[in-house]
Amino acid sequence: YPFGIPVHEVAAALLSGNGVILKVATQCQPVGDLIRRMIREAGFPPALFHLVHLGGSKAGTAFLDGGIDKLFFTGSTETGRILMQEAGKRLIPVSLELGGKDAMIVLSDAPLERAAAGAVWAGVSNCGQSCGGVERIYVERPAYETFLSLLRQEVRQIRQGPDSFDVDIGSLTTEEQRKKITQQVQEALSLGARLIESSPVETHAKPAQTPDLQGESRVQEGYPLFYPVQIIEVDTDTGSLMQEETFGPILAVSVVESEEEAIRRANDSSYGLTASVWSLSKDRASRVASRLQAGVVTINDHLMSHGMPETPWGGFKQSGIGRTHGDLLIEELTQVKVVVWERLPRMKRNIFWQPIDSAVYEGLKGALSLIAGKGIVPRLQGARRLFRLLARKVRFF
């Protein structure tokens, strides 16, 4: 993500005729250097692309005060809101790709084995650090127990550890993120949620503290940022685990009594980036998808459309402003200009220019009658009035 998200916007901006100033996340400086090297080796003029190294708190103001024409930002909703306010003071347009609290709806006729595997793929890939990943799962009651059993099996099989082809996911990126996830889980457990599964973490470094299946703090044998995959069973959508972005390997699962309840609860969020519907009925899946308040909805899949460059990417509500990818990204990177040519430039003046009198009014009204009059007589009368006006007003050099 630190490479893929900026590089497609940078490439599109350059191909659209823009110059680019790029600042990457503080934790990802080598990625910026790689993009700069790619641009240089592609043969673009050096002045078209600049990489800057600034702290996040300084970068926004520096960019906005530096005379840019548009600001693109990917990050938290809180930071995006601040940048939009500051850009608004300067009337600088913005495109914001922000957070998500993405919902997965599993209907009673869903392919449950695929749904369980898909929930783990979309919920914990990159250790759950995907803005478009699954964070909330709503399952219709007839499918709930079977789905939950399959989901637990999938989580038990997750292999987590350092870089290797023999592991499925790695670690979190920052200690700050680990603390946030831990706080959300502990708050949910205090509100009555149940931790029903936690994946094994087999690494060889210093220990860390994470909640165990009883909600108590336990020592995790592994590097502190290797947070286990956890399934949390919840009954209500209160609390930060269900309302705020988690950005970690936590799957919050809840049973619903109907597709109507699933839609209502999925939409009961300040975010609206992505969502998914799982069902073997095209009619049901389409009906539910059409009512979800999300910029991207996938059917029987999740966390995959970002890799389709032709499809627009962006969210509803507090998940962002604008769209990236595809034709809409090009529109975000260009200004609309209208150029109108007069077809009769040798005419001395248009018939509706001054001086104006009643004959002009009647002649123009006759044009309307000629075009839209009801019946042949009103149209012929309109044509007569129009031709009288043209004969009097039209003069060429």
Task: Locate each region found by the language model.
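Conserved C-terminal structural/oligomerization subdomain of aldehyde/semialdehyde dehydrogenase
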Residues: 105, 207-222, 226-397
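Conserved residues at the C-terminal ends of beta-strands
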Residues: 52-55, 74, 122, 279, ...
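Rossmann-like NAD(P) dinucleotide-binding subdomain of oxidoreductase/dehydrogenase enzymes
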Residues: 1-114, 166, 256, 380-383
